[in-house]
């Protein structure tokens, strides 16, 4: 596994640009599957997380309403909050450090795109954020602060809206970096450009819709993820709206 040399802020947050995350994600994707660059296809993201990043994957219900899609555990705990649907009650689970826990609602065929992006996202936390979250242990009244990060389904930071290293709290920046990493691994920058090289380039709505479909079909991602990847790579305008 390629191990990046990262610079960190005092809080333990990586100081890294979106472009450098793209470069790192692509390098890791190619290191894992060297054919992924010049023959664009869906990366086996589950195997990438488990075998390449060496992060075991478990499925548990993280809430009763799917508000949390994934959790990365940084320190072994007996107290990860989970929901037991059979008993309709909350409980705690033992989870080892370095484990990715995916909400059970994503373990369904019609949730494949969301599952794939969530796996990449949690992998991003594993690559970038152990130092940050472990540094926060004991920093609040909550006993579980820093032991794990629970990623909400309603968090959205996309495109260039939060480029660079400004405007975000550390917690928000961690989510943005994990999102960018997931996009970079699932849809490597060079592979996207190779994929779209054969079509006349313009920024019309028709071109955007067609490019989104091609990216979605080729990399097995949602059209929404494809749209924000195009925006993040500045292939469409920052203010462009989803065409559906």
Give the location of each predicted region.
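Active-site hotspot residues in diverse enzymes, especially metal/ion-binding acidic/histidine motifs
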Residues: 1-244
């Amino acid at each position: 596994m390629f191990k990046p040399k990262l610079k960190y802020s005092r809080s333990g947050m990586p100081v890294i640009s979106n472009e450098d995350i793209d470069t790192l994600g692509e390098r890791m994707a190619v290191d894992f599957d060297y054919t992924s660059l010049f023959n664009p296809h869906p990366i086996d993201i589950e195997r990438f997380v488990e075998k390449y990043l060496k992060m075991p994957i478990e499925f548990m219900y993280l809430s009763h309403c799917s508000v949390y899609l994934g959790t990365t555990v940084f320190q072994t705990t007996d107290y990860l909050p989970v929901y037991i649907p059979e008993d309709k009650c909350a409980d705690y689970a033992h989870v080892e450090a370095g484990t990715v826990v995916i909400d059970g609602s994503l373990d369904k065929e019609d949730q494949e795109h969301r599952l794939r992006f969530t796996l990449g996202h949690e992998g991003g936390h594993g690559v970038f954020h152990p130092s940050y979250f472990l540094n926060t242990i004991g920093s609040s009244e909550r006993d579980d602060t820093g032991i794990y990060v629970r990623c909400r389904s309603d968090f959205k930071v996309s495109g260039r809206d939060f480029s660079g290293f400004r405007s975000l709290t550390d917690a928000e920046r961690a989510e943005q970096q994990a999102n960018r990493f997931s996009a970079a691994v699932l849809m490597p920058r060079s592979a996207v450009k190779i994929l779209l090289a054969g079509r006349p380039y313009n920024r019309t709505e028709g071109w955007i819709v067609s490019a989104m479909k091609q990216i979605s079909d080729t990399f097995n991602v949602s059209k929404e993820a494809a749209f924000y990847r195009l925006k993040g790579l500045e292939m469409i305008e920052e203010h462009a709206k989803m065409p559906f």
